[in-house]
């Protein structure tokens, strides 16, 4: 099992750099930085992380081909690869329709858009010209092939991830979700003459770890509420939860009733949408994900009640694998 960690760049960048360095020191192999217009710029953040670290692989987790053109992303990730001496990884997904609506961006043909974007970026990163004549001139990646991970959720995206990417970043925390997702990734990989073992299947989890299990759970409840609000009915059905659960949380959060939303998060929702607990409780949960085909565990928001302490505790977990 490989281990990654996600940070949202909404804190001072100096703090994020220190936390990523700590993660590197305790054994994390990947750092994923979210890319959203209302936070700090992902590539400027990554550049400073590259300067402050030595071995950890790093990249956006995830960008999209609507807000940033594939050519701009290719240039940015090649520059990051140069700055980090060959440690760049690229996470790209279809994005969030609600965000695009707020920005006045039309969200059309996500599967074909992702497919075309990855093809263009691979061409540019190889130093070649695209059919329309675009070519990177003043920047060249250190790696011969920068790994490209696809953020994927739905069946078509999961199959496409298996077909054209090096890894799949899946927003899920429960083995049941990977029991459904991994066969689709495998199908896509085999359609392209690859095998499932060629794909790094990453569980992008809602993670909260602490020496106090209850404190860990409490820190994750607001994140679980937002995950529930954004999940479609089939996900709830998979976990034996009422199909209208998402609508209920959407209503609570929509009117700003965060306390009500937190209070409505029960044990079944926590089990479905998070990995929480003490280090001893974490180990079997990560092992269960591995049994379903997960090859990278990503510790996502909130990480824990105290990020620095929680990263050190995750280091204890990593040492068990």
From Swiss-Prot:
Induction pattern: Increase in abundance from the earliest stages of exponential growth, reaching a maximum level at the mid-exponential growth phase.
GO biological-process terms attached to the record: methanogenesis, from carbon dioxide; one-carbon metabolic process
Keywords: Cytoplasm, Methanogenesis, One-carbon metabolism, Oxidoreductase
Localization in the cell: Cytoplasm
Family classification: Belongs to the mer family.
Its biological purpose: Catalyzes the reversible reduction of methylene-H(4)MPT to methyl-H(4)MPT.
The protein's name in its UniProt record: 5,10-methylenetetrahydromethanopterin reductase
Underlying gene: mer
């Amino acid at each position: 099992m490989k281990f990654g960690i996600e940070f949202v760049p909404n804190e001072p960048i100096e703090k994020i750099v220190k936390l990523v360095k700590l993660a590197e020191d305790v054994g994390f192999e990947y750092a994923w930085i979210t890319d959203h217009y209302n936070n700090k710029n992902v590539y400027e953040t990554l550049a400073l992380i590259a300067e402050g670290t030595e071995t950890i692989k790093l990249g956006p987790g995830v960008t999209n081909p609507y807000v940033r053109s594939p050519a701009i992303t290719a240039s940015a990730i090649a520059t990051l690869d140069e700055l980090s001496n060959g440690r760049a990884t690229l996470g790209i997904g279809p994005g969030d329709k609600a965000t695009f609506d707020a920005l006045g961006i039309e969200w059309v043909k996500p599967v074909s858009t992702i497919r075309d974007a990855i093809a263009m970026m691979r061409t540019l990163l190889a130093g070649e010209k695209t059919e329309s004549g675009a070519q990177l001139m003043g920047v060249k990646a250190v790696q011969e092939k920068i790994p490209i991970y696809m953020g994927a959720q739905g069946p078509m995206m999961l199959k496409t991830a298996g077909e054209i990417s090096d890894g799949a970043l899946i927003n899920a925390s429960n083995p049941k979700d990977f029991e459904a997702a991994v066969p689709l990734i495998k199908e896509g990989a085999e359609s392209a003459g690859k095998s499932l073992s060629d794909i790094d299947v990453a569980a992008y989890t809602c993670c909260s770890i602490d020496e106090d299990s209850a404190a860990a759970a409490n820190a994750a409840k607001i994140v679980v509420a937002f995950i529930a609000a954004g999940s479609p009915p089939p996900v709830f059905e998979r976990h034996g939860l009422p199909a209208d659960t998402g609508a209920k949380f959407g209503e609570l959060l929509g009117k700003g009733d965060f306390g009500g939303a937190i209070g409505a998060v029960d044990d079944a929702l926590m089990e479905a949408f998070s990995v929480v607990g003490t280090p001893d409780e974490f180990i079997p949960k990560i092992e269960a994900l591995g049994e379903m085909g997960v090859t990278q565990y990503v510790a996502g928001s909130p990480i824990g009640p105290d990020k620095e302490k929680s990263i050190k505790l995750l280091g204890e977990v990593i040492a068990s694998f």
